[in-house]
Amino acid sequence: RENSVTMYLARRAAALNALHSAIPAGSSLPRILPAAEAAYFRGMEEHHPERLCIENTRTLMLEMPFSEWTDQQVETVAVLSLDLHFNVVLVHPERFCFSSSNRRRLEELAKLPLALQVNADTLLRWGTRRQGLELLELTATPLLGSDCHDMTKRPPNLKGGREMVRRKLGEAFLAQMDENARRLTAPTLAQV
């Protein structure tokens, strides 16, 4: 695992350098923060997870396994949040509610000081909207993600997702989500 994390970080740095060199000077593009949607792996709490955090933060965007979650996996998330003081963001939790066991474990995890980041696409589809809205309301720290991978098959769609949150949960809820995002991406003074 150590080698794969190190290799990933090197590839990310090279890609970021290429991106920065392609952006014209004085561009009005948003700030780009190096980060990772880190896939859960056993023992990750012992492998310097801060290297996978959003740059200069303690925010760890964590993708849980696409399987039935175990007690050990849930315990690792608790250790990352409570003992190691990471701001854990469970990304696209709606993908893991395929079983009542995972749904129950997700509800347990949502009681911890962590965030749930629901994909905007989930809110834009009638068949998944209700679950996405319920997950946003389940956590004290709701977030909206685009899960954008390209401009065709998985394009950015935050505008539509934000509008759905505004319509269904209200302007104050959307403002709180924006504040959560600002807080979790703001540089932290001390790295624990």
Identify the meaning behind each predicted range.
Residues L158-V192:
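Mid-to-C-terminal alpha-helical segments outside catalytic/metal-binding sites
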Residues A140-P156:
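Short acidic/histidine-rich active-site segments
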Residues H92, D147, A181:
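Conserved, mostly hydrophobic/aromatic
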Residues E94, N119-L124, C148-T152:
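Short, glycine/charged-rich beta-strand-loop motifs at protein surfaces that mediate ligand recognition
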Residues L124-T128, M151-P156, T185:
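Short active-site-adjacent structural elements
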Residues Y8-R12, R154, G170:
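Residue-level preference for long, well-ordered alpha-helices that form the structural scaffold
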